[in-house]
Amino acid sequence: MLKKNDIVEVEISDLSHDGAGIAKVDGLVFFVDNALPTEKIRMRVLKVKKNIAFGKVESYLAKSAYRSDNLTVDYLRTGIADLGHLTYGQQLNFKRKQVINSLSKIAGISDIEVADTLGMDNPTAYRNKAQVPVRRVNGQLETGFFRKNSHALMPIEDYYIQDKEIDRLINFTRDLLRRFDLKPYDEKEQTGLIRNLVVRRGHYTGQIMLVLVTTRSKIFRIEQMIEKIISEFPAVKSIIQNINDRNTNAIFGSEFRTLYGEDTIEDTMLGNRYIISAQSFYQVNTVMAEKLYQTAIDFSDLTPDDTVIDAYSGIGTIGLSFAKKVKDVYGVEVIEAAVRDAEKNAALNNITNVHYVADSAEKAMASWSKRGIKPDVILVDPPRKGLTESFIEASTAMQPRKITYISCAPATMARDVKLYEELGYKLVKVQPVDLFPQTHHVECVALLVKA
């Protein structure tokens, strides 16, 4: 029986859903970071449980032809790019396979063609948002990412998947914090001032927002810092302070103060303008979000007479992108601030046929149904946990001709598709989309039609 710190030669047979290598030894399934199928490795045993175990690569005896050496192992250790060691074409294949496996194993569906994953021409430096912790490492204030499953900061200058101008602003701000001797947050001692830097950048507008997350309100010499930042980065339109004095993993506290400029920035997506606040949910990969939303619109095959329900509507990015092509859009979102943003975004784009409510999707559906609203298409974009049974039942009771499902988790999508099929809807096509290159995450669009 293998035990901790034993070293054994193994061959990696597959990848897990989150990109770990899988090896089978003595009836145990081992999960090994930074190991790819067909690779032969010397593996150190880290932990053994009842049926599964964890190992690490001690050395490679034979490497995969699909291993990418563009990335240092540090990026894998932080989880920034947990698939960055796999060539990009194979990443896309892996993501398609995740969707196929989920549909087959969870929904029992294997007769639907899952299209090749839509990918990026340049699958790095794509993120329009960064959330970076500030800590002391070896006596110096540093910015970077935490190592996986820990709160030990790994200092980073090039974040690989973030917009390069965002990286430059983070490094510049870090240097100013050092220069002005502002103390980084110490989680253990609950001391220090600067907890996090959050940066957002409009992909098309170039407008930048910087949020300083602090433990208290006073920031020494903040006016001089702001002056230097806007002199070096004229695209910075908003500098905000957020105060978070709680012992929590949540990045933001409840209090926001605008220190410079506006409290929002703007960007465009599929031709519409959007106002983005520090807390707004806005897809972090603009180019691929446009492909995702356009795929959902194409699948829905909308007509000028259609009434569409946009469930989980956020700040309106999906519904507003097709509103001018249909009769009416009814949007529901549980976060009230997002609904207010959606209404502002509709006004900003002179769109008058959208109707938003702040409520649970289930309650909104019941209310619309009572009012006699009959949707032709229901478009859903739920969080990772997927849809509730009650939502699925309420949506099918309205008898739309199509349900277009945007998913960020193939397993919960497959579970939901199974219930939709039991209630008289048929899955007809699925398109995976790579919103998060270099990571194991995959989004997809699925079309269900009334049988």
Swiss-Prot record:
| Entry EC number(s) | 2.1.1.-
Q: Which residues form the TRAM domain?
A: 1-59
Q: Does the keyword Transferase apply?
A: yes
Identify the domain of life: Bacteria
Which InterPro entries does the record cross-reference, listed alphabetically?
Answer: MeTrfase_TrmA_AS (IPR030390), MeTrfase_TrmA_CS (IPR030391), NA-bd_OB-fold (IPR012340), SAM-dependent_MTases_sf (IPR029063), TRAM_dom (IPR002792), U5_MeTrfase_fam (IPR010280)
Q: Where is the active site?
A: 408 (nucleophile)
Q: Which residues form the signal peptide?
A: none
> Could you state a single Gene Ontology molecular function term?
rRNA (uridine-C5-)-methyltransferase activity
The residues that hold S-adenosyl-L-methionine are 283, 312, 333, 381
Sorted alphabetically, the Gene Ontology BP terms of this entry are:
rRNA base methylation
Pfam families in the cross-refs: TRAM (PF01938), tRNA_U5-meth_tr (PF05958)
The record's annotation in SUPFAM superfamilies points to: Nucleic acid-binding proteins, S-adenosyl-L-methionine-dependent methyltransferases
Q: Which UniProt keywords apply?
A: Methyltransferase, S-adenosyl-L-methionine, Transferase
- Tell me the protein family, please: Belongs to the class I-like SAM-binding methyltransferase superfamily. RNA M5U methyltransferase family.
Protein name in UniProt: Uncharacterized RNA methyltransferase SMU_788
